[in-house]
Amino acid sequence: MILNDILNEQRIYAMINDVPILRESEVHLFEELIGLYRPTSVLEVGTAIGYSALLMAPLLDEEEGHITSIELDDVRYEMAKYYINQSDYTDNITLLKGDASQVLTELTGEYDLVFLDGPKGQYLKQLELILPHVKEGGVILADNVLFRGYVRGDKEPPKRFKTIVKRLQEYLTYVENKELFNTTIYPMGDGMSVSVWKGHNK
């Protein structure tokens, strides 16, 4: 099946079934960033239905490019498998089923790009588990970091969002430490941060 047809089908499925995927306003930036860094080894937390993995796959290093993607939800994991199996990238994408906080403790590989797009309140905890496996100069992308304008805006978040907003603020404070990362935050969609890791000895 042609990749564009699969992506269109995924967009429709996501809209009908209320599955969070990259917003249209973010897709161009996302593809530009992946194309710019052209990673060989990618770790994604939060596969959902495999939309972002299939956006990344054709932009990776042609010979060695590989994506490892983690998803907790049973239905989304199966849908991601279904869509990826229809594509030409089945050999380039490995899906792992489970809670990322557990799966990440079992990592053995090294990654030059990480995409955080799972539970927003877990970003910092997950990054701390991932960093020992990130190559110096590796890139960490995190989606939804501005969370409806509450994280860096003047708006007071509703009570139900206060914990997630506080944790995203803590995440941004961490990745904006200039001794550890060079970080840029893009306002598209719900905000995406791009952090270049300076290495373990900094």
Please give the residue ranges for each predicted region:
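A short alpha-helical cap/connector motif
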Residues: 1-113, 120-141, 145-202
